């Protein structure tokens, strides 16, 4: 993908104004309407994985629900949590987003694209196969993604799996943990 010049400039400006350290972990934790397709993954699952794979204490989180950020800060205050998610965001619901004011919709999309760029730049990333942004970044970052709900060596075959099959595999993986 390639951004239009004006969009790229907005993304770059947003990132430049963000005081993120050079070395950091990136992850996406979904809320909102994702529960329609999959059970939402617990914040604790991400915290355990971060502690398992790195000593880094700076974490950028792409999320659509500010409650997740509040929960992370409460559960792991020793970490520095970064996000573009605003305190009024309570999860992405497609039906509501489609009715959002165009200027606010554009702002949220710029934040999303900037978040994707920051996840791609992360020293390492935590992802889930139940999330399209994570799947895209999993392909782009190849070996630099740690899956919270899947074995690393099973990733590429999973790209073509149906939602139902991914859900089943994720549930089986989490039961083994």
Locations of regions flagged by a protein language model:
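Core catalytic architecture of nucleotide-activated donor-dependent transferases building glycoconjugates
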Residues: 1-97, 110
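Low-complexity, intrinsically disordered/propeptide-like segments
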Residues: 17, 116, 121-122, 172, ...
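Residue-level detector of alpha-helix boundaries and kinks
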Residues: 57, 103-107, 122
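Short secondary-structure transition/capping segments
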Residues: 69-75, 104-115, 134-135
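Short, surface-exposed amphipathic charged segments that create phosphate/polyanion-binding patches used
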Residues: 93-104, 161-168
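A polyampholytic, Gly/Pro-enriched intrinsically disordered region
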Residues: 99-112, 172-176
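A donor-sugar binding/catalytic signature common to diverse glycosyltransferases
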Residues: 112-154
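Leloir-type glycosyltransferase catalytic cores
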Residues: 153-177
């Amino acid at each position: 993908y390639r951004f239009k010049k004006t969009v790229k400039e907005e993304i770059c400006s947003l990132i430049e104004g963000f005081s993120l350290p050079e070395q950091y972990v990136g992850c996406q934790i979904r809320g909102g309407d994702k529960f329609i397709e999959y059970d939402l993954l617990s914040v604790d699952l991400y915290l355990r994985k971060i502690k398992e794979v790195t000593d880094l204490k700076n974490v950028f989180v792409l999320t659509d629900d500010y409650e997740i950020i509040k929960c992370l800060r409460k559960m792991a205050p020793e970490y520095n949590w970064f996000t573009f998610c605003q305190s009024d965001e309570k999860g992405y619901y497609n039906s509501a987003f489609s009715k959002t004011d165009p200027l606010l919709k554009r702002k949220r999309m710029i934040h999303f694209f900037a978040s994707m760029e920051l996840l791609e730049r992360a020293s390492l990333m935590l992802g889930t196969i139940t999330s399209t942004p994570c799947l895209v970044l999993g392909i782009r970052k190849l070996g630099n993604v740690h899956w919270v709900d899947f074995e690393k060596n099973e990733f590429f075959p999973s790209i073509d799996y149906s939602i139902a099959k991914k859900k089943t595999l994720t549930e089986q993986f989490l039961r083994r943990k």
